[in-house]
Amino acid sequence: MPVRERPSMIVRPRPNFLQLFFIMRGSVVPRILPQIFGFAVYSAVILALARWFELDLGVFNITPFGLVGVTLSIYLSFRNNAAYDRWWEARKLWGTLVFEIRNLARATTSLIPDPAEQRALLMEALAFCHFLRGQLRKTDSIKDARAFIDAQAETVAGFANPADEMVRRMGRRANAQRRAGDVDPIGFRILDERLASITAIQAGCERIAGTPLPFAYTLLVHRTAYIVCLLLPIGLISTTGWATPLFTALIAYTFFGLDALSEELEDPFGTEANDLALDGLCRVCEISVFEALGEAPPKMLPAEKFYFS
């Protein structure tokens, strides 16, 4: 069967209270650790200087920082919601693709009398799934596609849009069956409708992959988060004292953690911890197709330390 890439989506049971603070796999903490540690050290330096020079920072009130923090939280919430909408729409599109592949398998085995032609068309459908996954992840999917269409995979990979070429090939194969009289016009229309739905799914995925969130939002959030964390120790020292580095690190964790999570969800087709398990969804399509053909299906891809690829 096709060779798989490194795992991406993490699925695990809800951790208990003690595990909650020590889980790193699937957490954004490793990505934002430099910011957390850096601002903790920075606030410790500010605190030490204030104590050494006996500076009176009581004139700095925490209220303005709270107002800025609320504003930043609103922007982070908007960006997080927008990123999650992209992630959820991508998941729905791939769920619909599984649905359409099953419909295509059922229609193909019912309407095309020749078992060899049935298998050829459905193998092209599976190659389409893998080419689409490769295009969305910007990875080489020739090895995966070769398992279903043999040497044709190299030829198809030479097209600007290999997944679209696979749909065209399926359409030509279905039309050849119609011209030969093996499939009547109504049956051909059913097959063509399935291919049209698959094309619409591909276009939806390409729209998400090709349209990132506006850069201005990212820039605004990053600038504001850094400014708040840089000025925050000055406003906290008079009230939190020696605990200032701890509170600064906690606030940095919140702001930069939400930002990092939004960045992961913004591109749902990648291979990070919270991206979609496209390899697993392709395997679901493979199982459905092989069962429709009456052949032994492959097994589901196992999780690797709670990760599904």
Swiss-Prot record:
Name of the protein in its database record: Voltage-dependent anion channel-forming protein mll4386
One GO cellular component term noted in the UniProt record for this chain: plasma membrane
Main location, first listed in the record: membrane
Family membership noted in the UniProt record: Belongs to the anion channel-forming bestrophin (TC 1.A.46) family.
TM spans (from-to): 32-52, 58-78, 227-247
Record Pfam families: Bestrophin
GO MF entries: chloride channel activity
Mode of membrane association: Multi-pass membrane protein
Compartment(s) where it occurs, according to its Swiss-Prot or TrEMBL record: Cell membrane
Keywords per UniProt: Cell membrane, Ion transport, Membrane, Transmembrane, Transmembrane helix, Transport
Highest rank taxon of the organism: Bacteria
